[in-house]
Amino acid sequence: MRPLTPRQTEILELIKRNIADTGMPPTRAEIATRLGFKSANAAEEHLKALAKKGCIEIMPGTSRGIRLTQEDAEVELGLPLIGQVAAGEPILAQEHVEQYFQVDPHMFKPAANFLLRVRGDSMKNIGILEGDLLAVHKMQEAKNGQVVVARVEDDVTVKRFEKKGNVIYLHAENEDYAPIKVDLTCQSLTIEGLAVGVIRNGAWL
């Protein structure tokens, strides 16, 4: 199989994840929406390229006519490493991906969707250290006590989640840092994912 471009890898990963989560492949329109394409036609062109490389089969006449090939089952896509996140952009936007690591997503429970490089020492008391790669399961809701990747206004942070009414507290695991208080009546907060594991700094570089 010929090597895939980063964009093709991203689309193939999206297809696999959608099948794993819902039991069916995404439509062209869903691919376009999730990856920021202007139209479903752009997604179709990438799907044709993946078909030529033997990763998928395209079945005409149905919006979900995408099937993974047996050959592709042997390909390890790896996980995208997210770097700096631009304000207002989806965390998994292609421009945020620094590189891909050959890590099995299913070694984490639940399975990881991406890696985030840890900056700072605010979570050091639970072993999340500067420079570590945090494995993250993409989700939009969290329970009290979970360690999450959250976007507060335009800043992305890793903290322990606590919700009390309309107020959310993001707690550090380091006595030097005060909790971040977010009043949902006047501030915005988005849960980007749940921390599911750590790859120690340098272990995979």
UniProtKB/Swiss-Prot annotation:
Catalytic residue positions: S122, K159
Known catalytic reactions: Hydrolysis of Ala-|-Gly bond in repressor LexA
Gene3D superfamilies named among the record's database cross-references: Umud Fragment, subunit A, Winged helix-like DNA-binding domain superfamily/Winged helix DNA-binding domain
InterPro entries (UniProt xref): LexA, LexA-like, LexA/Signal_pep-like_sf, LexA_DNA-bd_dom, LexA_repressor, Peptidase_S24_LexA, Peptidase_S24_S26A/B/C, WH-like_DNA-bd_sf
GO biological process, one term: negative regulation of DNA-templated transcription
Example GO molecular function: DNA binding
Keyword Ribosomal protein: no
DNA-binding region: 28-48
Entry annotated with the keyword Hydrolase: yes
Annotated keywords: Autocatalytic cleavage, DNA damage, DNA repair, DNA replication, DNA-binding, Hydrolase, Repressor, SOS response, Transcription, Transcription regulation
Site feature Cleavage, where: A87, G88
Enzyme Commission number(s): 3.4.21.88
Function: Represses a number of genes involved in the response to DNA damage (SOS response), including recA and lexA. In the presence of single-stranded DNA, RecA interacts with LexA causing an autocatalytic cleavage which disrupts the DNA-binding part of LexA, leading to derepression of the SOS regulon and eventually DNA repair.
Family annotation (HAMAP family): LexA (MF_00015)
Subunit structure: Homodimer.
Family membership noted in the UniProt record: Belongs to the peptidase S24 family.
NCBIfam families: lexA (TIGR00498)
Protein name: LexA repressor
Gene: lexA
